[in-house]
Amino acid sequence: MAVGKNKRLSKGKKGVKKRTVDPFTRKDEYSVKAPSTFQIRDVGKTLVNRTSGLKNANDSLKGRIFEVSLADLQNDEDHAFRKVKLRVDEIQGKNCLTNFHGLDFTTDKLRSLVRKWQSLIEANVTVKTTDDYLLRLFAIAFTKRRPNQIKKTTYARSSQIRAIRKKMTEIMQREAASCSLAQLTHKLIPEVIGREIEKATQGIYPLQNVHIRKVKLLKAPKFDLGALLNLHGESTTDDKGQKVEREFKEQVLESV
């Protein structure tokens, strides 16, 4: 008889399953708050592993980026084709305070804009806001028919495209460099810059569907908690100085 392992004895009991622990029992739920520049502040909830040992839950949450539809933030379906990126910068209690991190168009919207018989013009510019955020703005525009035009096509000449692109970069540079990130966000929501470009280029070639299709955050300044709390409307300190009035008393020297 061969000496070896008895296969029957080594087998465990059938039907006994390994006890599994639900991973969600170790997690906490945090609320994600959008800046006060948007109408709807509550973005949603996010999960994170509970603080244990050297692993802090706050450190895991900081830097998280959420992509939210602008239609949800503004409670307006007309903005459904735009997506806003929000970055978690600070944790207060069970709330994640976020800041603007970028903007983008949905793919289906971009595909629907591109059509036959028209010229597509794109421009991008790198600009620094007054509060030292380095951004790259991408603009898109399409030519349209002039009033009483009979010809089917609306192709612009290369010289006209260059002139339009120059105007686009100038307007984007001017509008973004003269304001803070929060003020720029206010301009991006109602598409103020797109309308400015459309108005300025009317004499070169009439345009339609002019949009800032993408905003990319390249570099952020050193984190400022006070500025973030002001952005969320949660600042309790009064930054304004108060005038100090003191009665002037002339000093008399007793001995010279």
UniProtKB/Swiss-Prot annotation:
Q: Which family does it belong to?
A: Belongs to the eukaryotic ribosomal protein eS1 family.
PROSITE patterns cross-referenced by the UniProt entry: RIBOSOMAL_S3AE
GO BP term, pick one: translation
Provide GO CC annotations from the record. Answer: cytosolic small ribosomal subunit
Q: Which UniProt keywords apply?
A: Acetylation, Cytoplasm, Ribonucleoprotein, Ribosomal protein
Disulfide pairs?
none
The record's annotation in HAMAP family points to: Ribosomal_eS1_euk
Q: Gene name, please?
A: rps1
The entry's protein name is: Small ribosomal subunit protein eS1
InterPro entries assigned to the protein according to its UniProt record, in alphabetical order: Ribosomal_eS1, Ribosomal_eS1_CS, Ribosomal_eS1_euk
Which region ranges are annotated with the description Disordered? 1-20
Keyword Heme appears in the UniProt entry: no
- N-acetylalanine-modified residues are 2
Instruction: Please give the superkingdom of this protein's source.
Output: Eukaryota
Q: Name one Pfam family in it.
A: Ribosomal_S3Ae
* SUBUNIT field: Component of the small ribosomal subunit. Mature ribosomes consist of a small (40S) and a large (60S) subunit. The 40S subunit contains about 33 different proteins and 1 molecule of RNA (18S). The 60S subunit contains about 49 different proteins and 3 molecules of RNA (25S, 5.8S and 5S).
Please note every region of biased composition (Basic residues): 1-18
**Gene Ontology molecular function:** structural constituent of ribosome
Location relative to the cell: Cytoplasm
